[in-house]
């Protein structure tokens, strides 16, 4: 309550260094001694999580591809996205292998970008007479940093806890959320997160994506911005960018070609650090739209 109007945002300039140096810097969010410094950087860690998910639920290469194709399709409708073109399944599945089963187009890119939000007290928001989004729930959760110490590689309990807490604060269920922005640093991450928050049963997010349920026009629109995969992943700006996209969707101000149908009121953002080591979950409610 000390301030009524504040600015919150982030920025990241990643392309001034080599890809190897950027990968090394990003690995600071992983366990260094026994994992990252031994070669287990994030592509490999998420590849192990993907292999585990595939073994447990029969998740297929085509399901991972569907995430990438969907998010690039959404990014092509976003003038602020890093990638401005749609891609085909063939492009994804013939791109170079990074860490089996993850190919180049399963991985979010190295990105320059920034995002900013104006956060105000509710009386200021109401007095403005403009559409705004209310923070209905907000939670943080942490989890094991060492992948090799987890008993189940493909589960993200920190994501589950953060989402449940934010939804409880908002007095809503995950099915009340009609727009989602989630941390698809790799295609398998989107699938695991959607299951961790309870939107889909374990093993069902991949088939749901393949069938179109998570498309902008689907029942559960996910990453209308293009996500990290298509919009880009300027790390320090990613969380604010997710909130910014939900603000546009929940107040009806997103461009018409990517506006979620049905005039959604509630949405959820899930931002993840590392392999789910840290999770921020936010529930927003559109007001005055």
What is the role of each PLM region?
Residues 2-4, 177, 243, 264:
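Short, high-confidence coil segments that cap the C-terminus of an alpha-helix
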Residues 40-89:
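N-terminal leader/propeptide and maturation segments of large enzyme subunits in energy/redox metabolism
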Residues 46-50, 121, 156-170, 245-252:
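Short, well-ordered amphipathic alpha-helical segments that serve as non-catalytic structural scaffolds
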Residues 153-160, 164-187, 191, 196, ...:
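Extended C-terminal subregions enriched in glycine
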Residues 147-152, 184-207, 218, 234-237, ...:
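Short glycine/threonine-rich loop-to-helix capping motif typified by GTGT followed
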Residues 5-57:
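Flexible glycine-/small-residue-enriched beta->alpha junction loops
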Residues 20-31, 123-124, 196-203, 286-289:
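A glycine- and small-aliphatic-rich helix-loop capping segment at beta-alpha/alpha-beta transitions
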Residues 32, 65-66, 97-165, 213-225, ...:
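Condensing-enzyme catalytic core mediating Claisen C-C bond formation in acyl metabolism
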């Amino acid at each position: 309550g000390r301030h009524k109007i504040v600015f919150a945002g982030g920025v990241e300039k990643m392309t001034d260094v080599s890809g190897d140096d950027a990968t090394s810097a990003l690995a600071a969010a992983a366990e260094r001694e026994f994992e990252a410094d031994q070669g287990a950087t994030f592509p490999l860690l998420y590849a192990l999580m993907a292999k585990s998910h595939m073994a447990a639920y029969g998740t297929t290469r085509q399901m991972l591809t569907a995430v990438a194709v969907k998010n690039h399709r959404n990014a092509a409708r976003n003038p602020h996205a890093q990638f401005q073109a749609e891609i085909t399944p063939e492009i994804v599945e013939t791109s170079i292998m990074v860490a089996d089963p993850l190919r180049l187009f399963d991985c979010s890119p190295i990105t320059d970008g920034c995002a900013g939000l104006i956060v105000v007290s509710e009386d200021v928001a109401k007095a403005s007479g403009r559409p705004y989004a209310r923070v209905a729930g907000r939670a943080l959760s942490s989890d094991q940093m060492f992948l090799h110490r987890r008993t189940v590689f493909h589960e993200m309990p920190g994501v589950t806890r953060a989402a449940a807490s934010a939804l409880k604060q908002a007095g809503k269920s995950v099915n009340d959320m009609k727009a989602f922005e989630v941390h698809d640093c790799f295609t398998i991450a989107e699938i695991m997160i959607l299951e961790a928050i309870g939107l889909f049963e374990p093993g069902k997010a991949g088939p749901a994506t393949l069938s179109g349920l998570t498309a902008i026009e689907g029942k559960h629109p996910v990453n209308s911005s293009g996500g990290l995969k298509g919009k880009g992943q300027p790390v320090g700006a990613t969380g604010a960018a997710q909130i910014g996209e939900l603000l546009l969707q929940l107040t009806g101000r997103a461009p018409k070609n990517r506006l979620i149908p049905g005039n959604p009121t509630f949405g959820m953002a899930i931002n993840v650090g590392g392999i789910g080591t840290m999770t921020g979950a936010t529930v927003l409610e559109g007001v005055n739209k």
